Amino acid sequence: MRRFLIERGLERKLIKLERKNKALYEQVKNKINEVLNILDMGHYKNLRHDLKEYKRVHIGSFVLIFKYNERNDFIYFTDFDHHDKIYK
């Protein structure tokens, strides 16, 4: 399993999500585990323009954004929000 960091803003969102929507919280937790254990990071879509160093994964109508440092094999989970709001 890769090393990872969940940024403070995302951590707050996940704590709030756990209280409000337990099912979605479990889906996010499972998706984070999937990202950490996958062999080919190229499987996840790269973002473009200002967010070009990030990758994304969809969870229903929500998006989890993360950055992968290939040299250190380290993942930074950055943000999670509805797909209409995440890129603004």
Pin down the residues of each PLM region.
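Enriched for short, Lys/Arg-rich terminal
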Residues: M1-F4, I15, R19-E26, I59-V63, ...
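A short, surface-exposed loop/turn module that caps and links secondary-structure elements
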Residues: N33-R56
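A broad, structural micro-motif
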Residues: F4-L5, G42
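Alpha-helix N-cap/helix-start and coil->helix boundary motif
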Residues: E11, M41, H83-D84
